[in-house]
């Protein structure tokens, strides 16, 4: 299931993407709301992960936008170290669940 990661810190987005891709997930990442909207508008994303530093107003707006563009699951993230362990324990099970229709 194609996943979009939105986070305000590019280095953290890169770490999340590295783990997801290493584990076989199709994932893209951005740091800005407009970039996220453009990608979501293009379709094909089933999951949106929104990082903990994304402001409440942006978060709410993007959740609504994602729902309008076929995203099955929005995950609110609050990344903790070690990042790879967090991604594997928190994000990946939810992505798999969304992919299976759950």
PLM regions and their residue ranges:
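Short hydrophobic helical patches associated with two-component signaling proteins
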Residues: 16-17
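Conserved phosphotransfer microenvironments
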Residues: 50-65
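Acidic, metal-coordinating helix/loop segments flanking the phosphotransfer/catalytic sites
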Residues: 31-45
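Short hydrophobic/Thr-rich beta-strand motif most characteristic of the beta2 strand and flanking loop
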Residues: 24-32
